[in-house]
Design a protein with these regions (language model features):
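Conserved glycine-rich cofactor-binding loop
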Residues: 13-14
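C-terminal helical subdomain
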Residues: 173-174, 189-223
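Residue(s) in the substrate-gating loop at a strand-loop-helix junction
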Residues: 134
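Substrate-binding pocket helix/loop in short-chain dehydrogenase/reductase
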Residues: 92-93, 97-105
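Active-site helix of classical SDR
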Residues: 116, 150
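Rossmann-fold cofactor-recognition segment
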Residues: 48-63
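Conserved glycine-rich Rossmann-like NAD(P)H-binding loop of the short-chain dehydrogenase/reductase
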Residues: 27-44
Length: 244
């Protein structure tokens, strides 16, 4: 990567995205910050310094995507694109509003597709595209069925693109465990191995600077979930039922 990287972070207004922006800015990167909240983005960009730019974006809106892509393209080739935008609404399936469920699919999965489709036009040759899955995508979790399904889809999307774009782009997958954000604060169950957004940001940046396809953390949780996902269903599903 270049000495001074240009990095586009989507989902930068809070949580992991905001922590990533702060950590990358501290490490000397030049940032393009996107999310739906223009006010939060402008405040973050002002806090980080004049070399960073806020570009509001709704990944579920094609006009917004086109406008943001045009703005990013004017900044010149980007070194990394990191897609973190996500929605989450925990609860039993009978309680989940169908329109909310559809929006979760649109933001988490279709939004990742839209960003992946734009990335080759905006990244420099060999640049990095990172999509955010989750340990919830390793195996379906109770009361997170739509979220788990979308994150499983993002994992498959990243795997497909890693093979499809080999030699053109460096496609990566980020799979966090439980991170203390507005999304996880909605859960009403014990979340093991919880980490702070700052810890998550450091793990992501350090992982993306290696050659590994998947960046997953904290390992004591992610390896356990990976093991659970390869067990036969008769063994795995009773165990997942105990997770919430």
């Amino acid at each position: 990567m270049a000495d001074t990287e240009t990095i586009w972070i989507i989902g930068a207004s809070d949580g992991i995205g905001e922590a990533l922006a702060q950590e990358w800015a501290w490490r000397g990167a030049r940032l393009i910050l996107s999310a739906r909240s223009a006010e939060k983005l402008e405040a973050l960009a002002a806090q980080l310094g004049p070399e960073h730019r806020a570009v509001p974006l709704d990944v579920s809106d094609r006009d917004s995507l086109a406008a943001a892509a045009e703005t990013v393209a004017k900044a010149g080739p980007v070194d990394r694109v990191v897609q973190l935008a996500a929605m989450y609404d925990p609860g039993k399936i009978a309680e989940l509003d169908p329109e909310t469920a559809a929006q979760i699919v649109t933001v988490n999965l279709t939004g990742s597709f839209h960003i992946a489709r734009l990335a080759p036009k905006l990244l420099r040759a060999g640049g990095q595209l990172a999509l955010c899955g989750s340990v919830a995508g390793y195996i379906g979790l109770p009361q997170g069925q739509i979220y788990s399904a979308t994150k499983a889809g993002v994992i498959s999307l990243a795997e497909s693109l890693r093979a499809e774009l080999a030699g053109e782009l460096d496609v990566r997958l980020i799979c966090p465990g439980f991170v203390d954000t507005r999304l996880t604060q909605r859960n009403d169950f014990t979340m093991p191995a919880m980490v702070s957004p700052q810890t998550a940001a450091e793990a992501i940046i350090d992982g993306l600077n290696t050659r590994r396809f998947e960046v997953h953390f904290p390992r004591r949780l992610t390896w356990a979930m990976k093991l659970l996902s390869v067990l036969p269903y008769w063994a795995a599903l009773p165990l997942t039922g105990r997770l919430t």
